[in-house]
Amino acid sequence: MAEQASFIDRLSARFAGAKVIVVEPRGEVTLEVPAAEWHATALALRDEFGFEQAVDLCGVDYLGYGSDEWDTADVSSQGFSRGVEGKAQGRFAWGEFPTEENGADGARPQHMPTQRFAVVAQLRSYQHNLMMHLRCFAPDEALPVVSSLTGIWPGLNWFEREAFDLYGVIFEGHPDLRRILTDYGFVGHPFRKDFPLIGNVEVRYDEEKKRVIYEPVTSVEPRVGVPRVIRDDARLQTAEGERAQEAVK
């Protein structure tokens, strides 16, 4: 613990303008920096702190973060139906945003995250036996761009391609930034929260044309089987506390 505390102090001193986040009880350390300092910070972590390996890199879409689809703390005849009707972005079709109430054709919610897209790199130092996360948010939601880290850790080449393919994050300076998982001509980025769960097109083999063709989705019903919930929701904790008090009486 003393070694980790020293490491956190050194991070805070070296990157004075950054945010150091420690998640308890596991003690996971995340250094959050502005996108403009993303590349320089990564280089310093490799050369000055001994993080010689980048284990992973991924994109994150924080659209709708902190919002759920479950309206009740207790089991009811209406709670689940409200959940499965789909209140979150992208549950039904492209570009549809729900209201605070039920329905998928309402207005865009008023409370949107100030920064939507983030990139997170997981770093490892073998010489110091340390692991940490480096995170930055893309400043422009419409066109998320951050610097490529392939010049520092070449092994991130395909990880950045994956984040580009699934989230649409552009890595400036990447030597070969093209899709890696989706098909040729794929429209959109499927891990974005506003991408429809049923997709935009479906694939089938056309017997007459003797080839695979794409058609608009028709065979999948847009239904949410598992509503989105928040772990340790305050409403749930309050309900449990009230039940515990009633049991004591």
Curated annotation (Swiss-Prot):
UniProt-recorded name of the protein: NADH-quinone oxidoreductase subunit C
Quaternary structure, from the entry: NDH-1 is composed of 14 different subunits. Subunits NuoB, C, D, E, F, and G constitute the peripheral sector of the complex.
SUPFAM superfamilies: Nqo5-like
Keywords: Cell membrane, Membrane, NAD, Quinone, Translocase, Transport, Ubiquinone
EC identifiers of the protein: 7.1.1.-
Functional summary from the UniProt entry: NDH-1 shuttles electrons from NADH, via FMN and iron-sulfur (Fe-S) centers, to quinones in the respiratory chain. The immediate electron acceptor for the enzyme in this species is believed to be ubiquinone. Couples the redox reaction to proton translocation (for every two electrons transferred, four hydrogen ions are translocated across the cytoplasmic membrane), and thus conserves the redox energy in a proton gradient.
Localization terms from the record: Cell membrane
Gene name for this UniProt entry: nuoC
Pfam families with a match to the protein in the record: Complex1_30kDa
EC primary class: translocase
Major subcellular site: membrane
